[in-house]
């Protein structure tokens, strides 16, 4: 079996976007929470609290419901505001150390992104760091219906479809910083198996962003404690194929 593609999460995996996402979230919530500055949800009071809430909930909809107190109808409206507010905020997130080196060293393999951020915002960041040509498919939250967000595998399937690769006797690698990313990858593997494909999905946890995969109920296949660990893991997988 060969590695046909490497799929990535974006926030907390390719880039450290926490500070930008906090500010964008505040702007979005001002449409729903009167006097937000005096009624700031705990999750937005610090980077640490934001990351704690982000890892606690399965996806952005749960985050907005339980951490910010929005109704389902308000969450739908907030979803429509995320892309324009992200694009309006010109702040560029920092790419994790040596990530451009890692991506360029794996450029012989097709790359895609499955994210709950907006695809245009992701592309703009990749272009700034001059690695946009390495990514052949970018699926953002707006490319998938609200009922099919992670860990539903729909975004994974759509991303792979755009990559136009062979699925049979193939290995797909998925890299993410959240337990739900691992579940997301395994859900996609189960779908491919149900369709008769001999497709193996290897899930790598991006622990360099600060999460603790040892505490996860659903464990990744590998853990990257630094970005360059990803290269070592890919080489290990290739040697076993």
Predicted regions and their residues:
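Substrate-recognition element of Asp-dependent hydrolases with the DxDx(T/V) motif
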Residues: 25, 102-127, 141
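N-terminal helical cap/lid subdomain that shapes the substrate entry/recognition surface
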Residues: 3-97, 101
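Short beta->alpha linker loops
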Residues: 20, 94-98, 117, 151, ...
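Acidic, Mg2+-coordinating phosphoryl-transfer loop and its flanking beta/alpha structural elements
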Residues: 174-225
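Substrate-recognition "cap/lid" segment bordering the active-site pocket of phosphatases
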Residues: 92, 118-173, 179-193, 197
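Structural recognition of alpha->loop->beta junctions
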Residues: 131-142, 213-235
């Amino acid at each position: 079996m060969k590695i046909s593609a490497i799929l990535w999460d974006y926030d907390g995996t390719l880039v450290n976007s926490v500070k930008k996402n906090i500010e964008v979230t505040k702007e979005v919530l001002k449409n729903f929470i009167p006097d937000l500055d005096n009624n700031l949800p705990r999750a937005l009071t610090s980077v640490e609290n934001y990351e704690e809430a982000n890892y606690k909930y399965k996806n952005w909809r749960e985050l907005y419901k339980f951490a910010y107190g929005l109704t389902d109808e308000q969450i739908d409206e907030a979803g429509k505001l995320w892309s324009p507010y992200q694009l309006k905020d010109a702040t560029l997130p920092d790419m994790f150390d040596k990530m451009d080196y890692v991506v360029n060293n794996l450029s012989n393999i097709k790359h895609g992104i499955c994210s709950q951020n907006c695809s245009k915002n992701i592309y703009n960041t990749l272009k700034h760091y001059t690695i946009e040509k390495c990514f052949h498919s970018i699926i953002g939250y707006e490319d998938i219906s609200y009922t099919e967000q992670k860990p539903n595998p729909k975004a994974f399937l759509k991303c792979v479809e755009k990559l136009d690769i062979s699925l049979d006797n193939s290995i797909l690698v998925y890299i993410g910083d959240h337990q739900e990313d691992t579940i997301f990858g395994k859900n996609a593997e189960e779908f491919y198996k149900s369709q008769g494909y001999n497709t193996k999905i290897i899930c790598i946890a991006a622990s360099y962003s600060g999460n603790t995969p040892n505490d996860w109920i659903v464990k990744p296949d590998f853990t990257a404690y630094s970005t360059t660990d990803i290269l070592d893991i890919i080489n290990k997988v290739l040697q076993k194929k």
